[in-house]
Amino acid sequence: MERARRLAYRGIVKRLVNDTKRHRNAETPHLVPHAPARYVSSLSPFISTPRSVNHTAAFGRHQQTRSISVDAVKPSDTFPRRHNSATPDEQTHMAKFCGFDHIDSLIDATVPKSIRLDSMKFSKFDAGLTESQMIQHMVDLASKNKVFKSFIGMGYYNTHVPTVILRNIMENPAWYTQYTPYQAEISQGRLESLLNFQTVITDLTGLPMSNASLLDEGTAAAEAMAMCNNILKGKKKTFVIASNCHPQTIDVCKTRADGFDLKVVTSDLKDIDYSSGDVCGVLVQYPGTEGEVLDYAEFVKNAHANGVKVVMATDLLALTVLKPPGEFGADIVVGSAQRFGVPMGYGGPHAAFLATSQEYKRMMPGRIIGISVDSSGKQALRMAMQTREQHIRRDKATSNICTAQALLANMAAMYAVYHGPAGLKSIAQRVHGLAGIFSLGLNKLGVAEVQELPFFDTVKIKCSDAHAIADAASKSEINLRVVDSTTITASFDETTTLDDVDKLFKVFASGKPVPFTAESLAPEVQNSIPSSLTRESPYLTHPIFNMYHTEHELLRYIHKLQSKDLSLCHSMIPLGSCTMKLNATTEMMPVTWPSFTDIHPFAPVEQAQGYQEMFENLGDLLCTITGFDSFSLQPNAGAAGEYAGLMVIRAYHMSRGDHHRNVCIIPVSAHGTNPASAAMCGMKIITVGTDAKGNINIEEVRKAAEANKDNLAALMVTYPSTHGVYEEGIDEICNIIHENGGQVYMDGANMNAQVGLTSPGFIGADVCHLNLHKTFCIPHGGGGPGMGPIGVKNHLAPFLPSHPVIPTGGIPQPEKTAPLGAISAAPWGSALILPISYTYIAMMGSGGLTDASKIAILNANYMAKRLEKHYPVLFRGVNGTVAHEFIIDLRGFKNTAGIEPEDVAKRLMDYGFHGPTMSWPVPGTLMIEPTESESKAELDRFCDALISIREEIAQIEKGNADVQNNVLKGAPHPPSLLMADTWKKPYSREYAAFPAPWLRSSKFWPTTGRVDNVYGDRKLVCTLLPEEEQVAAAVSA
C-alpha cells in the first residue's frame, strides 16, 4: 500500500509540473507544420499557430462556474466544415502566401467587380441543414413516395439488385468516385468490367461491336438514327419509326431529327413504304412496346433491298431466349441494360447500349473499350478509337456524348457475371412463365380478350373499360399501362411473384370469385415463343461469365478489379474542367432507398410526391444560384444539356419567325462538346480566337456578330474561361450578341467558380446547363452517370422540353408553353441521382456554397504560386490571379528533354496521382483543378510530386539521364516490371517505385506498363478474347 501511495503522489506532482509548463508556454506562438496523417511536405510553407491553452483547472484549485453559450449547444454535425477542407487559419496563410491579406482580398482581385454579386440568399435551406437534419428531411420526402407494384413496362422494369453488387459497386466510393478511364494504366479494373459489358451486348444482340454505354434507350435510338444518316452521307432524309416502338423513344428521335433536317415518319409495320427512295433507316422494337414478338427476317430483307438500314430496339433479358437481332440481319441494335440489376429510380440513371457491325465501327457514338498491350507486351485495356469523339473532332464528331453511364454499365455487367448464361436464361424463362400464367388465367376468366401474338414478358389485353380496370388495380397498389380506352398491357419482371399474379386475377375478376390460383395454372402453361424465334446460338461463353456465381467469388472479383483503379479514395484527381470534388456519404445515402429506387418513371405523379417536392425545391435553389427564371431537370448529361439549351434557343427563334437564325459563334478554346452540340442542332459554326492572355478576342466576337447579325442564333461561352481566367469583358461580349439578335449560351462546366460570387443570369447569359456531376457533387462513376439540367431566362422558359407520357416543362412552370419534345427518355432524366445535388446544396446553405467557390479559387492560386518557379503558369487574370483551375506549360520540355505531357502524367502515377487534363485547351500543357474539398496537405503533396518531376526533367536537360531511357519515359512502373528477373533501366527499381517519402507508408500501384495506343487501334478488339487468343495476341505483340 505504501508503495502504491508513493507512486500516486509522484504522478500528481508530475501532472502539476506539466500543467505549469503548459500555462507558461500557452502565450508563445510556435511555427508548426499543418500536419496531415499521411505526410508533411518538406517543401510546404509553414503555418504559425498558437498552442492550445489548457483551460482545465489545476489540481487543488476550485473550479469556476461558467455559463454555457448558445453556440455550444447548437448541432455539431454541420456539413460545410466537412466539405470545405481549408480551415480559417489555413485560408489566411494560403492567401498570404499568394500575396493577399486574406481570402476575400484574393477573391476581390480575381472576380471582376462588374459581375460580382453582393450575396446569395435561398428561400429555403439558406443556413444549411445539418447532416442529421438532412437525413430526416430525405426520410420525410421518401415517405411521400408510394411504391406500387409496377406492371407498366415500356422499357423500365423492377429488378433484384444483387446485394453484393449494391454494396460493393453502387455504394462503394472506390467505384463511384473514379474518373473516365483516359489514364488506362490506373483504370484497368473498370476497363475490364466495361469490356465485360460490351461482351454481354455483342453476345446477346448477335452483332460484333458495342460501345461502353449511352445515356438511355431513347437517346441510343436517336444516335442510331444519326448513324443511318451518316452512313448514307445525308443523301436520304427520311427516317421511319414503327408504331410498335416505345412512345418516349419515338419522341426523342423526333426532337433529335429536327437538328439533322431529317423527316421522321411513324407508321404501322404493315404500312411502311420505301417507294420514295428517300428513307435512310427504319426503327422497330423487338419485342414490341405492347409485348408482341415478331419475326423480322423478311422485313429486314425488304428494307435492305431498298437500301434502308434497319435499327432494332430490344430487351437484353428477352434476348437470352429469343433469336438475336443480328441473326435477322439488323444493322444497328439499341436498348437499355436497366433490367440487369439496375433500379428503375423514377427514370434513371441506366446504361443504354448500341451495337453494330465492324463496317460501321468508326461511326459509332460513345466510348469504346479495346484490347491492346503495354510496354512489356502484356495485354492491357484502353479506350479505343478516341479520334471519333467530340474532344478531338469537335463539330465533326460522331456525337456530342461525353459522360455516359459507366457505373450503371458496370453494375449490369456484374449482374451478368453473377448470374451467368444459365442464370439469366432461368430468370427469363421464369418471367415468361409468369406472363403465360396470367394470359392463361385471363382466358379462363373470360373477362377480357388476350393478344394472340407471341409474347415474352408483356401481355396485351382488350377490355371494355381500360381506365376502370387500371383504377381498380391502383386500389390494390398495382400500376398497369393504359394504352387506350380499351387496351391494357401488363409487363412482368424478375420481382413478380405468383401472389402478384393472383392479385391481378382478382382485379380483372371485378369482385367475382377466381376459381384457380396462379400456382395451379403453372402446369398448363405452354411456351408462347415459336421455335423459329427461339434462341439457339450460345452466349456468354467466356470463363468470366461462368466462374463467379457465388457471392464470395464475385466479391473477390469486384475487389480485384477495384484494386487496379485509382479513385478519390486514394488521392486527389486534379483534372482541369472536371471538378472531382467530395461525394459525401450523406449525399449518397438516399440513392439506394427503396422509396426512391423502386418507382417507375411513368407511375402516376401523385404516387411520387416526395420526388415532386424535391424537384420543386431543387428548381428554386438552382434558379437562385444561377440567376435564371426556370429550370428543366430532364437532360441526363452535360452534353444533353448543351443540346437541349441550343434547341430551346432554336425554338425561340422559330417562334419569332426567325427561321434563318442558325449561326453559332464558338471560341476556339471551347469544350469539344460545344461545336459537336451546335452541329447536332443544324447550326453553322463560326470560331473566334483568343488573345495572348487567354481571353476571348472581343473584337473578333464583335466582327463575327455584326457580320452575321441577320442570321446570328447564339454564342457559346464558358465562364470562367477554359483557360482558367475570369475574363473582364464577359458582360460586354453578352451585350454584343444581344445587340445583334443572338442569345448567349453559357457552358456550366466551370460553375464551381461562380456559385455565390456571380451567376450566368447576372452576367447576361440566356441559358446555361449545369454539370451536376461537377459543381453539385454527383460522382463521376468512372464515366457516368451525370446530369445536365438547363436554366433559362423568362423568354425561353416556354420552350423547355416536355414528355409524351408524363407532361413536364419548366420548374417553375411558365404561364405559356410551347415545349420542345423529349430530350431524354424519362420525364425528369436520371431522377434517382438528383437527391445527391439536392442534399449537397441544402446542407451547404448559401454561405457554405459561396465559401466553396472561394476556397476552390484559393486552392488553385496557392498551387499555381507553389508551382510557378518550376513551370510557367500560362494564363492569369488582370491582377495576376487564376480562377479555380490553371494551366502549366510543358511545351518547352519537348525541345530541352524530349518530354511531353503524357510522360509527366504517367510518372505522376508512380507518385500515386491521376494526371491533370492533358494538352487541352492548349496542346503541350497540363490543366489543374484542385476543388475546395482537398486539404492543404494534399495540395502540397501533389505540388511536391510535380516539383520532383521537374527535377527529373532537369536531370535529362543536364545530360545526367538519357533522353529516351529515363524514369519519365519508362513510367509508370507496375510491380510486374519492378519484380522482373532482369532490370536494364539506368535508374534503380527503388527510385522508380518510391520517388517520394510518403509512398513508403501507402502507395497506389499501377497494374500495367504504358499502354500502346497505336497497337490498340490498329488491331481493334472490343470484346473478351478466349484465353488461347489472349496468349497468341501477347506473343505477336
Curated annotation (Swiss-Prot):
Means of activity regulation: Inhibited by harpin, S-nitrosoglutathione (GSNO), nitric oxide, N-ethylmaleimide and 5,5'-dithiobis-(2-nitrobenzoic acid).
Disulfide bond positions: none
E.C. designation(s): 1.4.4.2
CC terms in the record's Gene Ontology section: apoplast; chloroplast; chloroplast envelope; chloroplast stroma; chloroplast thylakoid; cytosol; mitochondrion; plasma membrane
GO biological processes: glycine catabolic process; response to cadmium ion
TM annotation in the entry: none
Tissue expression profile of the protein: Expressed in leaves. Detected in roots, stems, flowers and siliques.
Keywords, sorted A to Z: Glutathionylation, Mitochondrion, Oxidoreductase, Pyridoxal phosphate, S-nitrosylation, Transit peptide
Cofactor: pyridoxal 5'-phosphate
Extent of the transit peptide: 1-67
Subcellular location: Mitochondrion
Chain positions found as N6-(pyridoxal phosphate)lysine: K774
Disruption phenotype: No visible phenotype; due to the redundancy with GLDP2. Gldp1 and gldp2 double mutants have a seedling development arrested at the cotyledon stage even under nonphotorespiratory conditions.
List of residues that carry S-glutathionyl cysteine: C98, C402, C463, C777, C943, C1022
UniProt PTM comment: Glutathionylated at Cys-98, Cys-777, Cys-943 and Cys-1022 after S-nitrosoglutathione treatment.
Catalytic function, reaction form: N(6)-[(R)-lipoyl]-L-lysyl-[glycine-cleavage complex H protein] + glycine + H(+) = N(6)-[(R)-S(8)-aminomethyldihydrolipoyl]-L-lysyl-[glycine-cleavage complex H protein] + CO2
Gene Ontology molecular functions: glycine dehydrogenase (decarboxylating) activity; mRNA binding
Primary site of residence: mitochondrion
A Pfam family reported for this protein in Swiss-Prot or TrEMBL: GcvP2_C
Assembly behavior: Homodimer. The glycine cleavage system is composed of four proteins: P, T, L and H.
Function: The glycine decarboxylase (GDC) or glycine cleavage system catalyzes the degradation of glycine. The P protein binds the alpha-amino group of glycine through its pyridoxal phosphate cofactor; CO(2) is released and the remaining methylamine moiety is then transferred to the lipoamide cofactor of the H protein.
NCBIfam families reported for this sequence: gcvP, PRK04366.1
HAMAP family assigned: GcvP
Membership in a protein family: Belongs to the GcvP family.
Protein name according to UniProt: Glycine dehydrogenase (decarboxylating) 1, mitochondrial
Lineage: Eukaryota, Viridiplantae, Streptophyta, Embryophyta, Tracheophyta
